[in-house]
């Protein structure tokens, strides 16, 4: 019991360091967005990278993910969730970008061409 009270009475250095790193990452993202001459897509990728690092930092420093008995399982589940989210977002962007340029929607015909607008055998 005395061990737990001594454990809770120390200064929260881990939280201070996490907060300071979060501020630094936010200011770096602001600097990249405002003061660099990079292209918009490069800025976007860099800011997303900083956001991903900051999310991991928040989870590890403030959410105490690794401090329980099954901390490894929590980290694994979180990484799997991030992987699933990244696959869904990047897959959606890929599908939208790859199929937007086919041009089927530009000529007024339904996708697949005019030959598919009426199904054979269903004409009245």
Swiss-Prot record:
<protein>
    <recommendedName>
        <fullName>Quinol oxidase subunit 4</fullName>
        <ecNumber>1.10.3.-</ecNumber>
    </recommendedName>
</protein>
<keyword id="KW-0560">Oxidoreductase</keyword>
<dbReference type="GO" id="GO:0009486">
    <property type="term" value="F:cytochrome bo3 ubiquinol oxidase activity"/>
</dbReference>
<dbReference type="InterPro" id="IPR014250">
    <property type="entry name" value="QoxD"/>
</dbReference>
<dbReference type="GO" id="GO:0019646">
    <property type="term" value="P:aerobic electron transport chain"/>
</dbReference>
<feature type="transmembrane region" description="Helical">
    <location>
        <begin position="78"/>
        <end position="98"/>
    </location>
</feature>
<dbReference type="Pfam" id="PF03626">
    <property type="entry name" value="COX4_pro"/>
</dbReference>
<keyword id="KW-0472">Membrane</keyword>
<dbReference type="GO" id="GO:0042773">
    <property type="term" value="P:ATP synthesis coupled electron transport"/>
</dbReference>
<keyword id="KW-1133">Transmembrane helix</keyword>
<dbReference type="GO" id="GO:0015990">
    <property type="term" value="P:electron transport coupled proton transport"/>
</dbReference>
<dbReference type="InterPro" id="IPR005171">
    <property type="entry name" value="Cyt_c_oxidase_su4_prok"/>
</dbReference>
<dbReference type="GO" id="GO:0015078">
    <property type="term" value="F:proton transmembrane transporter activity"/>
</dbReference>
<keyword id="KW-0812">Transmembrane</keyword>
<feature type="transmembrane region" description="Helical">
    <location>
        <begin position="16"/>
        <end position="36"/>
    </location>
</feature>
<keyword id="KW-1003">Cell membrane</keyword>
<dbReference type="InterPro" id="IPR050968">
    <property type="entry name" value="Cytochrome_c_oxidase_bac_sub4"/>
</dbReference>
<comment type="function">
    <text>Catalyzes quinol oxidation with the concomitant reduction of oxygen to water. Major component for energy conversion during vegetative growth.</text>
</comment>
<dbReference type="GO" id="GO:0005886">
    <property type="term" value="C:plasma membrane"/>
</dbReference>
<feature type="transmembrane region" description="Helical">
    <location>
        <begin position="44"/>
        <end position="64"/>
    </location>
</feature>
<comment type="similarity">
    <text>Belongs to the cytochrome c oxidase bacterial subunit 4 family.</text>
</comment>
<dbReference type="GO" id="GO:0016682">
    <property type="term" value="F:oxidoreductase activity, acting on diphenols and related substances as donors, oxygen as acceptor"/>
</dbReference>
<dbReference type="GO" id="GO:0009319">
    <property type="term" value="C:cytochrome o ubiquinol oxidase complex"/>
</dbReference>
């Amino acid at each position: 019991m005395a061990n737990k009270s001594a454990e809770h009475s120390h200064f929260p250095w881990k939280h201070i360091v996490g907060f300071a790193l979060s501020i630094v990452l936010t200011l770096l993202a602001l600097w990249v967005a405002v003061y660099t001459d990079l292209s918009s897509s490069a800025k976007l990728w860099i800011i997303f990278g900083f956001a991903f690092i900051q999310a991991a930092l928040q989870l590890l420093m403030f959410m105490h993910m690794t401090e329980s008995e099954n901390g490894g399982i929590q980290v694994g589940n979180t990484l799997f969730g991030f992987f699933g989210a990244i696959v869904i977002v990047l897959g959606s962007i890929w599908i939208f970008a790859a199929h937007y340029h086919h041009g089927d929607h530009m000529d007024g015909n339904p996708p697949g061409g005019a030959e598919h607008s009426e199904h054979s055998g269903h004409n009245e």
